[in-house]
């Protein structure tokens, strides 16, 4: 779909977005999978609206509504709001901490090895290995778990080779929409960076042709379509951009064939069953890094914009977003409820529009 919308001119690959992991976990626990899919489909619609705004007003219009002083703290909240889930899983528990699945000491060792492997590969890896540190961390953690008897292969044996994916269709839930919608801010900002990055590699200006409004529209269309089939949102994959630069292969058609291959793999039942055998501590160790990395992206967003966070206006906006988002503040009126990332994002946008710019204070 993305290649169709962008006229097969951008060699970039769409895959599942890590930015949505935390809100998806919370959404499934709170409202269930169908309602969460509704919120994720709305994220795609948000991309549509942004693409229309960019087409009519230009890319600078987005920065007026969502400047770094808003997007940075919101991205930080996304990474921090479910940090406890990663820690619980690293300790061998379920995400909410209610059930112990693996003895704590054993789980912490496995999580630490998985985390350390991921970090070391990202720092010291060469060539293709540097592009897949998370996969390396999972493989090493999985290998450590095998002799400890923490991997149950019975689901793989029961699964058939050919099987239809478990399609789940969205179910209307306005609260889920309000909670997940602000999360789309981070991938939207990342989208611009990835388009600039792939353009610098191929020496093409994709912001002009086919235009960032087309690339963002294609991203949104793919995200909404994935949600209607029970899948996670998509994002322009930075790892594949790195692979394009490494291999010097700029043909967008290769991305189309890669996408077709990924779709075909979804019909191999044993692959899905094998992924479900990954022990909880392995993913817990990885998620510590993933959620922390999302938070760091938020901090870096403000650093790159050279924001003076001691300026009273900037301090007020950032402080309200982070504390309200992480602290659990909620607003309820009848059946309407707003909390978490959704409330934090809306408060940030409103404060940015309402508070006067004032003078720059060092």
Language-model region placement:
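Helix-loop-helix hairpins and the membrane-proximal interhelical loops
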Residues: 1, 96-100, 130-213, 361
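Membrane-embedded helical hairpins/re-entrant loop segments and their flanking transmembrane helices
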Residues: 1, 5-6, 182-252
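Juxtamembrane transmembrane-helix boundary signature
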Residues: 1-16, 50, 54-55
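Juxtamembrane helix-loop boundaries in multi-pass membrane proteins
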Residues: 8-18, 64-78, 210-217
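Membrane-interface helix-loop-helix modules in multi-pass membrane proteins
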Residues: 9-42
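Hydrophobic alpha-helical interface/terminus motif in multipass membrane transporters
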Residues: 24-27, 62, 83, 198, ...
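Membrane-embedded alpha-helical modules
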Residues: 29-152, 257-362
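Membrane-interfacial loop-to-helix junctions in multi-pass transporters
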Residues: 33-34, 68, 105-109, 169-177, ...
């Amino acid at each position: 779909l993305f290649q169709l919308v962008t006229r097969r001119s951008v060699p970039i690959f769409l895959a599942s977005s890590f930015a949505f992991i935390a809100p998806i976990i919370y959404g499934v626990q709170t409202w269930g999978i169908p309602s969460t899919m509704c919120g994720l489909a709305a994220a795609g619609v948000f991309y549509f609206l942004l693409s229309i705004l960019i087409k009519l007003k230009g890319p600078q219009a987005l920065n007026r509504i969502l400047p770094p002083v808003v997007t940075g703290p919101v991205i930080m909240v996304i990474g921090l709001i479910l940090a406890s889930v990663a820690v619980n899983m690293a300790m061998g528990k379920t995400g909410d901490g209610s059930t112990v699945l693996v003895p704590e000491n054993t789980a912490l060792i496995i999580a630490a090895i998985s985390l350390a492997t991921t970090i070391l590969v990202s720092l010291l890896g060469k060539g293709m290995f540097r592009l897949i540190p998370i996969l390396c961390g999972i493989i090493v953690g999985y290998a450590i778990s095998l002799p400890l008897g923490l991997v149950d292969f019975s689901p793989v044996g029961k699964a058939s080779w050919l099987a239809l994916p478990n399609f789940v269709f969205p179910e209307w839930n306005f609260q889920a929409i309000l909670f997940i919608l602000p999360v789309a801010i981070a991938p939207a900002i990342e989208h611009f960076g990835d388009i600039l990055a792939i353009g610098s590699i191929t020496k093409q200006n994709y912001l002009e042709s086919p235009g960032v409004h087309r690339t963002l529209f294609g991203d949104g269309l793919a995200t909404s379509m994935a949600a209607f089939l029970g899948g996670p949102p998509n994002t322009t994959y930075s790892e594949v951009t790195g692979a394009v630069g490494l291999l010097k292969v700029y043909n967008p058609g290769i991305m189309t064939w890669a996408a077709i291959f990924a779709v075909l793999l979804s019909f191999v039942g044993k692959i899905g069953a094998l992924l479900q055998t990954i022990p909880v501590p392995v993913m817990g160790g990885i998620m510590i890094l993933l959620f922390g990395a999302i938070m760091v992206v938020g901090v870096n967003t403000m650093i790159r914009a050279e924001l003076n966070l001691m300026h009273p206006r900037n301090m007020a906006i950032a402080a309200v977003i982070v504390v309200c988002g992480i602290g659990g503040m909620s607003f309820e009126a009848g059946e309407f409820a707003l909390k978490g990332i959704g409330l934090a994002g809306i408060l940030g946008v409103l404060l940015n529009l309402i508070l006067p710019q004032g003078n720059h204070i060092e």
